[in-house]
Amino acid sequence: MRHMQSATRATLVCGSGVKQIIAKGHPNTRVFGARKARIPEREVLAAKPKITRITHLNLQPQERQAFYRLLENELIQEFLSMDSCLKISDKYLIAMVLAYFKRAGLYTGEYTTMNFFVALYLANDMEEDEEDYKYEIFPWALGDSWREFFPQFLRLRDNFWAKMNYRAVVSRRCCDEVMAKDPTHWAWLRDRPIHHSGALRGYLRNEDDFFPRGPGLTPASCALCHKASVCDSGGVAHDNSSPEQEIFHYTNREWSQELLILPPELLLDPESTYDIHIFQEPLVGLEPDGAALEWHHL
């Protein structure tokens, strides 16, 4: 009797051990005849295709009209005219401002110049690679004491961002939807020139162009826009005979003397180091025997 009880107890122990191994899913254990239970509800859910939810702003006419009235504000008009290159206020950035107003749930009475500059600054934060240009917004929004108050401005930006539930990404399709409501409005005709697309290399930057100017000062002259306007008008920027001479003549006058402009056909290896030597003009063009003179190092 005692032997039978011990045998039964051993069987129970062995049986419980097997259950534990199965429960743990031992990799070498395979149970024959076991099938996974089918759940019809899961099969139906898996068969349904994924539907991408498209969100619409659903801008009301009164909201669009209030925004257009805001754009006619004298300060904003002067600011937009200052941005002649459309680096910080092209049509897509302005469309993002209106989208931000809608997402933040602003009433039309809250369509103010300060909220405009805050939203425009946030739009530049999200979309623009060149971060220095957006600092021009500070003196327009804060006045002459912008150096003292710009930390508060950045807090306003963060609060505005939080009011939108941090949904600051606006797709191009959404911007096109905003502009399609009133496609002939002048704000949606502010196309950025192609020569101002993309980022600018550090050695091509003029540090004076990044310092905020603010109201009352003329915008910095842009050599690229000037040359493009001359070409668009059918004129000739310079009467040099060769394109290379035209490039050098133009850039030497417009850019800093510390900037070296190379011909477009000259390719340099960015991993290599080059020594630059500046030469003077030769004293005489040719030797009596026709051999060319060497240039003199400075």
From Swiss-Prot:
GO molecular function, one term: protein kinase binding
Pfam families documented for this protein: Spy1 (PF11357)
Keywords: Cell cycle, Developmental protein, Meiosis, mRNA processing, Nucleus
GO cellular component, one term: nucleus
Compartment(s): Nucleus
Domain of life from the UniProt record: Eukaryota
Chain spans, region Speedy/Ringo box: 61-193
Oligomeric and partner information: Interacts with cdk2. Interacts independently with cdk1 and with the cyclin B proteins ccnb1 and ccnb2, but doesn't interact with a cdc2-cyclin B complex. Prior to oocyte maturation, the mRNA is found in a complex with dazl and pum2 proteins; pum2 dissociates from the complex during maturation.
Role according to the record: Stimulates oocyte maturation by promoting meiotic G2/M progression in resting oocytes, via activation of the MAPK cascade and cdc2-cyclin B. Also activates the kinase activity of cdk2; this activation does not appear necessary for oocyte maturation. Necessary for polyadenylation in oocytes.
Family according to the record: Belongs to the Speedy/Ringo family.
Descriptive protein name: Speedy protein 1-B
Source lineage: Eukaryota, Metazoa, Chordata, Craniata, Vertebrata
